[in-house]
Amino acid sequence: MTGYKDVMSHAEPDYCAEQRELIARLEQDLRVQLAHKQHRLAHSLSVASCAEGLALLYGVDPYKARLAGILHDWEKALTGEKIVARARELGIDMGVDLELVAPLLHGIVAARELPARYPEVPPEVWHAVKVHTTAAPQMSPLDMVLFVADGIEPLRPKTPGIEASRALVGSTALADLFWESFVGGIIYVLKGSRYLWPGTIDTYNRLAAARERAGAL
């Protein structure tokens, strides 16, 4: 594979029977969970395929990437108000009123609730689900793969920013691809005059400092 089109047309890896069984079970459960939100279901399955392809391209475990993609928007079955209420019940603290960051909470809530339901899912998958909306100062390759896949999967519109990220697939390192996607997301929020979580600013500053130290700029 050399680019975005190859990523999205990749052949499924040769998973073992247990892995195929869990993938099928999670996909079926997701279809039930998001039965009333077909667009979200289609997006989730598309992210799973994109994440799997990116993982194959960048040397990340494609099985874990596929699982993370399937599960990342699980809590989107709930309304924003219900996600906020559930986050409060779980004691999630974002440092600000949770209603201000409602769009960021679904991954965090899922990562807290779903491990008990699916204990066979590796913990690093749950971490990727947790940070797929917020990012974090320390992002594993799996975290980066899910974050990027969520933004560039083919059902997303062909905006200049998304197309720019798609064009980088395979021609730049995963860390640089993630960085462009992360910064593009911040720009999108700012252009829309929406609330930018202070934690995002902190993550940006820490990642930027780390890239500067590494000579990436």
Named regions from a protein language model:
Residues 182-185:
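C-terminal beta-signal and terminal closure region of outer-membrane beta-barrel proteins
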Residues 12-19, 171, 175, 193:
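Intrinsic-disorder-associated interaction segments
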